[in-house]
Amino acid sequence: MILKEPEIGLFHQLITPQEAENMKHLARSKMISTPYNVGGKNELFSKLRTSKIMYMNENLVKEAMAVSRKIHWATRMNLANERFASENFQVMNYGIGGKISIHLDSTGEVIENGTSSNDGTSEWSKIGGQRFVTFMVYLSSVEAGGATAFPQPGMSIKPEIGSALYWFNMGAQNNFDSRILHLGNQSYI
């Protein structure tokens, strides 16, 4: 754990460089422009997020199953891909200059002036609820830029191949924890 309140943790070398390469290879040909939720509508391109994504079902891809097992061993969290357990893996590629603006993962919506417009009736509610925990495994190291930054606690984590960053999006009362607002800085190299 690198921060206790709000809880943010980092595992070094959770997966091997070869496992990271395998995941990237599987995803590369299936990536699409990442949709971004702006005002309750998904847009395929936004100045708020520039990336490509591929959704990977851990039950169908042996490499994803292996990563899921490692996450379970490290955290004891049940990642069974069921309605109320976890989402499909999201393999993201931000590329050079790619970024994501400040947001909360638990709302699934853009943050304007530090607040969310989510009233609890979003798509999240329709598919079983909020994302309580985010677990991000870095599949590449980045020489310049690319850090995941948390402005309120004033910290950023540089991507390192195989490391895994996690944080809790919701507070003890099942409320959005605004201290976990975060962004992905532009990658330069």
PLM regions: where:
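Fe(II)/2-oxoglutarate oxygenase catalytic core
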Residues: 1-189
